[in-house]
UniProtKB/Swiss-Prot annotation:
One of its GO terms (cellular component) is cytoplasm. InterPro entries: bL21-like, bL21-like_sf, Ribosomal_bL21, Ribosomal_bL21_CS. NCBIfam families: L21. This is Large ribosomal subunit protein bL21. It comes from the Bacteria. This protein binds to 23S rRNA in the presence of protein L20. Belongs to the bacterial ribosomal protein bL21 family. Part of the 50S ribosomal subunit. Contacts protein L20. One of its GO terms (molecular function) is rRNA binding. The keyword rRNA-binding applies. Keywords: Ribonucleoprotein, Ribosomal protein, RNA-binding, rRNA-binding. One of its GO terms (biological process) is translation. It comes from Teredinibacter turnerae (strain ATCC 39867 / T7901).
Amino acid sequence: MYAVIAAGGKQHRVEEGEVLRLEKIEVATGETVDFDQVLLVGSGADVKIGTPVVEGAKVTAEVVSHGRADKVTIIKFKRRKHHMKRQGHRQWYTEVKITGIQG
């Protein structure tokens, strides 16, 4: 069984037992989180598509860890002007393990 959920402004295809990196969620490590915005639920040839969400469907997950992604370096450069600006960014993420799909 699989599902498509909306979390953190993105859509993710998930299956039970899968570990997934999402945008940061303010939930402590080890706690469970429920995703109610389930856009699609499928099991073999049986597929339920929501308009926009599937009624009564829910995906539960356990928070595994929080962290920061690899650094992305931004460089702004103006030619012939001796001007260069460097900046780095590391995005926070939450790693969750999908424990159940209902619907």
